């Protein structure tokens, strides 16, 4: 059994977790998350400099709490891991420097983890997670991607958003409707009282230079603009804006786009397992629609546990355990952080000469 202490500080959650595995069974001993939502809500979104300062303030307490809850001393940990890319650079540095300092202080091996690989690994804490190749829909505030994971756990991105990620669109529409930040939970809550078929909002596509459209890619900027124009027309007509109906219609269209393109991609690549992870994966409309539509195509859906959909250190620990178990990977202590790094470049984090 390997025990990993993992740190996640890529955006606005400060998280430390202790995880372990015995064979194919992964266990969470502690997963402490300190959210900064209240600090950023007044600004309508995450302020990078403020987020980094809050990580500095919160991380010592969160680390102590994680060790205490797991009933373990840091000397008993086998590996230490932290998110190193992609994310807000100042925030990533706080977690990375802390992790590498602990490694040097306690003579522990270090693993730098790709944030998206962490989200993909959150499914390892679910029962009967897929052991063979599968398609992952990663849908969060910063990313909307379709990633194929093969039998050897190699990763290939098959689809992506060309502008706003789905979670980003939720946040922007939430602000537009006066629902505050973060928009996802607020829209989902008020949409329960609305008619999802009230407004016919667009399902935007990306044109293919060869003709037609890119089958697996996403665009949510146009949908956001359509909601803005709808609200403007209603206001100009002197009518009351039906916020629940708009929220429900918006939520439905986002879910339909995600589900339709995910299932199309899975069918085309002959993948009969679909994994859904990331913050937006907590949306109940999306979860129900994905299961319902996939079942019609004999595709099995694996959903990330609700408490592991948003950013957390347990998923980073799971990614580290997976790297140790199947790849025997470790990172150089000189490895830095990067604001951008594609999922296909994740293996570079374990090269003798760090990429950054």
Swiss-Prot record:
Single GO MF annotation: iron ion binding
EC category: transferase
EC number: 2.3.1.234
Cofactor(s) needed by this chain: Fe(2+)
UniProt xrefs under InterPro entries: ATPase_NBD, Gcp-like_dom, KAE1/TsaD, TsaD
Catalytic activity entry: L-threonylcarbamoyladenylate + adenosine(37) in tRNA = N(6)-L-threonylcarbamoyladenosine(37) in tRNA + AMP + H(+)
Alphabetized UniProt keyword annotations: Acyltransferase, Cytoplasm, Iron, Metal-binding, Transferase, tRNA processing
Keyword Transit peptide applies: no
Positions with a binding annotation for Fe cation: 115, 119, 311
Binding-site residues for substrate, renumbered to this chain: 138-142, 171, 184, 283
Gene3D superfamilies named among the record's database cross-references: 3.30.420.40
Cellular component aspect of the GO annotation: cytoplasm
UniProt-listed SUPFAM superfamilies: Actin-like ATPase domain (SSF53067)
Cellular compartment(s): Cytoplasm
Annotated cofactor note: Binds 1 Fe(2+) ion per subunit.
Similarity section: Belongs to the KAE1 / TsaD family.
Function according to Swiss-Prot or TrEMBL: Required for the formation of a threonylcarbamoyl group on adenosine at position 37 (t(6)A37) in tRNAs that read codons beginning with adenine. Is involved in the transfer of the threonylcarbamoyl moiety of threonylcarbamoyl-AMP (TC-AMP) to the N6 group of A37, together with TsaE and TsaB. TsaD likely plays a direct catalytic role in this reaction.
Name of the molecule in the record: tRNA N6-adenosine threonylcarbamoyltransferase
Species classification: Bacteria, Bacillati, Cyanobacteriota, Cyanophyceae, Synechococcales
Name of the gene this protein is made from: tsaD
């Amino acid at each position: 059994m390997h025990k990993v202490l993992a740190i996640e500080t890529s955006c606005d959650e400060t998280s430390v977790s202790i995880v372990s595995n015995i064979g194919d069974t992964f266990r969470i001993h502690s997963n402490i998350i300190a959210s900064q939502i209240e600090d950023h809500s007044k600004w309508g979104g995450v302020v990078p400099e403020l987020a980094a300062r809050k990580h500095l303030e919160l991380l010592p307490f969160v680390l102590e709490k994680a060790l205490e809850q797991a009933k373990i001393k840091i000397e008993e940990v086998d590996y230490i891991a932290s998110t190193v890319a992609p994310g807000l650079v100042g925030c990533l540095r706080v977690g990375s420097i802390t992790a590498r300092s602990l490694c040097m202080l306690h003579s522990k091996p270090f693993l730098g983890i790709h944030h998206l690989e962490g989200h993909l690994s959150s499914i390892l804490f679910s029962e009967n997670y897929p052991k063979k190749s599968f398609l992952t829909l990663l849908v969060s505030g910063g990313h909307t991607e379709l990633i194929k994971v093969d039998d050897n756990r190699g990763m290939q991105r098959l689809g992506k958003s060309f502008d706003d990620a789905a979670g980003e669109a939720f946040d922007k529409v939430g602000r537009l409707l006066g629902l505050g930040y973060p928009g996802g939970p607020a829209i989902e809550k008020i949409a329960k009282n609305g008619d999802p078929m009230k407004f016919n909002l667009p399902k935007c596509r990306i044109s293919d230079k060869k003709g037609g459209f890119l089958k697996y890619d996403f665009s949510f900027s146009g949908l956001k603009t359509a909601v803005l124009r709808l609200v403007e027309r209603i206001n100009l007509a002197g009518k009351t804006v039906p916020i629940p109906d708009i929220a429900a219609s918006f939520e439905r269209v986002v879910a339909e786009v995600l589900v339709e393109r995910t299932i199309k991609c899975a069918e085309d690549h002959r993948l009969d397992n679909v994994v859904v992870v990331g913050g937006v994966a907590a949306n109940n409309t999306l979860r129900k629609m994905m299961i319902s539509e996939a079942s019609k195509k004999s595709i099995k859906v694996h959903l990330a546990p609700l408490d592991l959909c948003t950013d957390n250190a347990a998923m980073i620990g799971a990614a580290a355990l997976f790297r140790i178990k199947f790849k025997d990977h470790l990172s150089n202590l000189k490895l830095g952080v990067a604001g951008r790094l594609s999922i296909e470049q994740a293996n570079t984090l374990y090269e003798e000469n760090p990429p950054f």
